[in-house]
Amino acid sequence: MSATHVWRAVLISLLLSPGLIAQSGGAASSTTQCNLDDGRQVYMRYNAVSAKNEKLSNGKPWTPGGSPMTLFTEAQLTLGSSMIPIGAYTVYPIPARDHWTLAVNKNVTPGAGYDEKQDLARAPMETAQVAQPSDTLEVAFAHVGARCTLRIYIGKTASFAEFTAK
């Protein structure tokens, strides 16, 4: 069995685990993915929370529904000028009035708090206001070539960050 098949099996099992937890009464979890041209994939798991129930604090890492988003990647990625190796990471959007920042963190221990010293990558996000507000958190990838652009929509805010596969 090739390393790619092993990684896929691990990622699929990790992605299915939250669905089982959600069925047993835990927080609802959603997943979005980006399929790269060479067949490798990038996944983001997050809690699809209501925009009305979330409090975003300027300059503070945001954990939708009390849990960070989780990034799984089968490809080496860059975010800004930082390299992100193949693996699993926590992702923290950091809202601000005019722009957001995206932090990719090495600590994937369940229940662990955010520790900036564990950041592997940080990059500014393009941020805009949209005319039609989103009632729930929506996270999606837009794929072009070797790039997966992460799109986060909550309320009237839309923020974007670009990951590039190596």
Question: Locations of the language-model features?
Answer:
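Generic detector of short alpha-helix boundary/capping microenvironments
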Residues: 10-11, 27, 69
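Bacterial N-terminal signal peptides
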Residues: 8-19
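Cleaved targeting-peptide boundary
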Residues: 23-30
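N-terminal secretory signal peptides that target proteins for export/translocation
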Residues: 1-6
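Extended, well-structured beta-strand/loop surface patches
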Residues: 37-86, 92-166
